[in-house]
């Protein structure tokens, strides 16, 4: 179990293919997870479908990067059951402040 998660350790874990989890929001204990399957978004070969392009042009949504990292993280953690506890949240915020974690923020309307 990991007691203190700092940004360097978090980056090292991600680079090694593992990530931290907690059993609940209320615990301070962490463990590392090495998933058998991983999701990869191949951005080099990304194709924008006509329907998605139309939705983007509609102006209904606005997309920004790193404008609301803390709120995005809090939203991800704000669930009845979550794997994001306070130590993970703090480490992610520190990593973001150091330039190593980013958010894609999607806003509906103004």
Task: Annotate each PLM feature.
Residues 1-109:
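N-acyltransferase acceptor-side catalytic subdomain
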């Amino acid at each position: 179990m990991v007691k203190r998660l700092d940004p360097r350790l978090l980056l090292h874990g991600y680079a090694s293919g593992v990530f931290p989890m907690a059993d609940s929001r209320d615990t301070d204990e962490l463990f590392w997870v090495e998933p058998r399957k991983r999701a990869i978004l191949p951005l080099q070969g990304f194709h924008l479908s006509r329907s998605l392009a139309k939705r983007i042009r509609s102006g209904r949504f606005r997309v920004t990067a790193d404008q609301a990292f803390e709120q995005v993280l809090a939203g991800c953690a704000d669930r009845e059951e979550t794997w994001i506890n306070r130590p993970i949240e703090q480490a992610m915020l520190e990593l973001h402040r150091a330039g190593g974690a980013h958010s894609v923020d999607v806003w509906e309307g103004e």
